[in-house]
Amino acid sequence: MNQGHPQPDMYYSPHYSTPQYGYGYSTNGAPTTAVSTPMPAPQNVLPVPSALSNQGAMQQPGYSNSSNNGAFDTTGQHNPPGMKPRVTATLWEDEGSLCFQVEARGICVARREDNHMINGTKLLNVAGMTRGRRDGILKSEKVRHVVKIGPMHLKGVWIPYDRALDFANKEKITELLFPLFVHNIGALLYHPSNSNRTSQVMAAAERRKHEGLGGQRPPAPNALPSIGQHHPMMPGLPTGGYVPQSLANGPQSLASTPQPLANGSQPPMPNGGGMLKRGREEEEDLHRPVSNGHDPMSNMHAMSNGYPQQPPLANVHQPPMQNGGDMLKRGREEDDEVHRSAHNAHDTMNNMPGSMPGMSNAYAQPLPNVHHQPLANGDGGMLKRGRDEDDDHRSSPNGHDSAGNFEAKRRKTITSNDSMVSPGGFYTLHNGYGQPGVMNGMSPYKRRDDEAETPRPGPNVHDHLNNFDLKRHKTMETSVPAPQYDAMNRPHSSIGTSPSYAPAPVYDNLARPASTVAASPSYPSAPVYDTAARPPSAISAPRRQQSFG
């Protein structure tokens, strides 16, 4: 928020060439004499304190205050002699109001434009009042508005205009705060030299105030209108008479261009029509009937790149290319390969133009010399990268069958019997249900193929999951059988002991004396004391002497 960045031309300058002030202000504050240019010094955030200029004005001749002649202005509408008004304006964005600011004694006192309330805290600070007295006076006010956030000169307790004027008169600071209490304070900003600038500032403040209110009030008459009101034909704003250029070349040509004739020439297309040449050759191959009814994918391994070579059409003249050439060709090649398995009457995708919805194995009826109207702008190049993944599910040039071709060949072998062909040219469905749709070009029997590829026990099966157990089982069968222990024919002691050590000897306690069994073999046997032969004092006396000593 702007905290008061006044322009040099928004208020009057305190410097004049002569100390006499021979002009007076009317009620609206318009001066009668032109003033000099503003001072060239750079301005601060707030204008120079007017108290300094007021002190200089007191020393000027002709100035009389209330102490001299009692001519004290209690209304605040007339300027003191030798003093010129200084006022700045700032938009208070938080409150959505314009604030007029007057500085006295280095303190900025603000007044709102909408309700004319004045910051009482700053006003009493100009009077030099202590904080305790100031807060006590402001708390006793019935109508007050406390502001705790925002710029410093806007914080404080805001009081009505009348109460602020009473406080200023009691503290004798009304003239010091001139022109804070002037009724038409906004007119002081309209200096003859900067009236245009002031009008722009006021209009901008009014416009921002309405924007801050969220459009609750009608916009100001001098506010800028919206872009759509003055520029209805701008490119970013589509109107009723605006037609996008992309429709003129793209979808419009699809609706207005007639279908090409069967054996005639096609008209040249304005935008990328020639890029469909090789793409249409692939489109013709989609609808070309298959003579033998066999899968053309069976011959794919003999090709160099996995695509069968088809002769170009001889009876249809293709339009010339202008721009965008090869984009749809490669995209249509992938589209051709996706549908190519459907030409041999083994369509698992059920997407041939002549196939019946409920019969997925129906033979597709050919549509000779009928073309699909392609896109005019030639965005088919986007199809190639999207359908490269579909090529991975068909055939690769190294001769290995993927899941889709393996299943197609297997079904070709099963359904090649003539007894399974109905007179109408359709393969009969044995269970009466159509096969489910295919996603991403994958065969519906892919999961069954994966289950069929599960390794089974055999001589040539690779090691996958179950063969590890199979080899381990064979190893266990060919290994030397473990010896069978006969616990009945062996002594009990030899089973529980280690074979490297001799069995422990069994001692006969009856044949040996008890002293030799308990004594260590490296030391002689301890003598046996006869307590009956010795007096008891001889045995226990040394211990008593040691215990008491």
UniProtKB/Swiss-Prot annotation:
Pfam families: KilA-N. It is found in: Nucleus. Residues 532-549 have a biased composition (Low complexity). Residues 516-545 are annotated as: Nuclear localization domain. SMART domains: KilA-N (SM01252). It comes from the Eukaryota. Keywords: Conidiation, DNA-binding, Nucleus, Phosphoprotein, Sporulation, Transcription, Transcription regulation. Residues 86-192 form the HTH APSES-type domain. InterPro entries: EFG1/Phd1/StuA (IPR029790), HTH_APSES_sf (IPR036887), KilA/APSES_HTH (IPR018004), Tscrpt_reg_HTH_APSES-type (IPR003163). This is Cell pattern formation-associated protein StuA.
